[in-house]
């Protein structure tokens, strides 16, 4: 990484004024900073983009990413409700590699040792850097300074705020869903990978330009009670196990 300009913040720590090409506001103290601007707005959706049947299914993750317009430099998000049993994130970046895409920013709500294969994608240029909690091998890789960009760790609420306040723009959100229907309604209450609520992915579903739901339990419409609304979803695909 290039040398960073550092300033002393209100907590007495030297911190950069720019992170991954964006201005960073040093901590000023409690109630000392008044944010300006407006919240981000999600794109307008239209029925023109979807089949009359409401069936948004595509054959696989690679097809979904291609349909979503994945290209170099985009931000791709995932959630961590499946924790150290998540098969989806690795599949996403394997597919991105097959598509020849480079310099992606991965924006997980958290990552775990199971995601260690993504180190290979940082080495081969598919992933530029990660902004999200990094546990295990990924955390070590970042801490030792191997990542081309700077790692950014946010609280769960801080991640949601960063998305809604436009600090982070998600180009493509990939949401692992234990149960979903072909329209994109989804929840985590049932299915082989049932995990409970999908709240960590809520902001992603609401603000991302494109939203892909990946499930191993595709059921008939309607999937109720849904937490991820199909109206916010562009593509649905399946894996043998998520």
Each model region followed by its residue ranges:
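Conserved alpha/beta enzyme-core scaffold
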Residues: 2-242
């Amino acid at each position: 990484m290039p040398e960073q300009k550092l300033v002393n913040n209100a907590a007495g720590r030297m911190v950069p004024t720019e992170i991954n090409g964006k201005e960073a506001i040093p901590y000023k103290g409690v109630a000392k900073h008044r944010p300006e601007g407006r919240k981000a707005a999600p794109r307008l959706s239209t029925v023109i983009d979807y089949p009359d049947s409401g069936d948004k299914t595509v054959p696989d993750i690679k097809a979904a990413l291609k349909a979503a317009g994945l290209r170099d430099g985009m931000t791709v998000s995932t959630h961590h409700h499946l924790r150290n049993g998540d098969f989806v994130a690795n599949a996403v970046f394997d597919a991105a590699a097959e598509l020849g895409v480079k310099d992606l920013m991965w924006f997980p709500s958290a990552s775990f040792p199971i995601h260690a294969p993504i180190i290979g994608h940082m080495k081969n240029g598919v992933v530029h850097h990660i902004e999200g909690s990094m546990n295990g091998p990924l955390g070590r890789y970042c801490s030792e300074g191997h990542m081309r960009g700077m790692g950014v760790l946010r609280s769960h609420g801080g991640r949601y705020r960063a998305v809604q306040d436009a600090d982070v723009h998600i180009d493509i959100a990939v949401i692992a869903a234990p149960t979903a229907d072909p329209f994109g309604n989804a929840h985590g209450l049932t299915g082989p990978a049932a995990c409970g609520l999908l709240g960590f992915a809520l902001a992603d579903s609401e603000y991302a330009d494109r939203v892909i739901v990946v499930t191993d339990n595709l059921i008939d419409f309607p999937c109720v009670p849904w937490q991820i609304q199909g109206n916010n979803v562009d593509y649905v695909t399946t894996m043998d196990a998520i």
